[in-house]
């Protein structure tokens, strides 16, 4: 009975409070296909959590419930978005009603970018980084304000301007109530977060994640990491050494093969 209670609580946590945003989420944005909007909407009776896909290729047809959810998402993210991207707000352009495949009435919509002093234009014309921020912003708002939320994002930095990434990480590090777990290749995170909050991947599959050792308060963690790549000094190898000469030689060989095959 005790274990069933624990399992039930874990299930409730996963359904309500756990967000996992993987590379597929980012991939459909990079391919300019779909904007998957991660969200959680709370209400008096019940809450809703999930991904609401909005097409980047054409208009999207939503039923009444999904349109209501989208309006709530846009209202929440616009509160924050214009401070991250100055002057930017998102609008829902409605083109009228259209029957859905199940025979119910749907609403044909398109997401538009609205900037001060400029005509609105389709959101697909924005950069990949801005679209990604929009897609995860509701989830970030939830994690920032709710201590029960755990938000995990694979490759948070992908497509996002380095300075904006640093600003977001600093704000979360200083003020967030929930938990943000993410992977990143961008070293900006090393300058914005406390060393205790960062783990590094290694080349040892049996001990794949470690904390850096011998880090002083005055050390720049980014410099320590780069130095550890070239000189070592950590308990595990964090980068398999490569040779720029061998890489250049391989490129030359490949170039000769291309010419010989022409």
Describe each region flagged by the PLM.
Residues 73, 105-239, 257:
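Switch/communication elements of ASCE P-loop NTPase nucleotide-binding domains
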Residues 241-255:
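Conserved AAA+ ATPase small/helical "lid" subdomain
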Residues 1-133, 231-237, 253, 257-262:
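Phosphate-coordinating catalytic segments in nucleotide- and nucleic-acid-processing enzymes
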């Amino acid at each position: 009975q005790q274990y069933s209670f624990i399992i039930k609580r874990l299930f409730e946590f996963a359904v309500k409070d756990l967000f996992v945003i993987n590379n597929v989420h980012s991939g459909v944005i990079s391919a300019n296909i779909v904007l998957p909007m991660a969200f959680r909407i709370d209400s008096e009776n019940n809450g809703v959590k999930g991904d609401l896909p909005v097409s980047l290729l054409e208009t999207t047809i939503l039923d009444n419930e999904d349109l209501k959810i989208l309006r709530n998402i846009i209202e929440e993210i616009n509160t924050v978005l214009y401070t991250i991207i100055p002057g930017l707000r998102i609008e829902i352009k409605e083109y009228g009603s259209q029957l859905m495949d199940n025979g119910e009435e749907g609403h044909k919509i398109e997401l538009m970018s609205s900037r001060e002093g400029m005509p609105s234009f389709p959101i697909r014309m924005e950069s990949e980084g801005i679209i990604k921020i929009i897609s995860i912003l509701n989830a970030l708002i939830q994690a920032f304000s709710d201590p029960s939320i755990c938000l995990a994002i694979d490759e948070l930095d992908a497509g996002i301007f380095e300075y904006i990434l640093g600003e977001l990480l600093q704000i979360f590090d200083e003020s967030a109530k929930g938990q943000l777990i993410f992977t990143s290749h961008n070293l900006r995170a090393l300058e914005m977060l406390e060393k205790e909050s960062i783990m590094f991947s290694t080349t040892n599959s049996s001990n794949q994640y470690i904390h850096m050792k011998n880090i002083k308060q005055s050390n720049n963690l980014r410099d320590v990491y780069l130095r550890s790549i070239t000189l070592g000094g950590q308990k595990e190898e964090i980068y398999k050494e490569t040779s720029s000469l061998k890489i250049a030689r391989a490129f030359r060989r490949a170039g000769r093969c291309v010419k010989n095959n022409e």
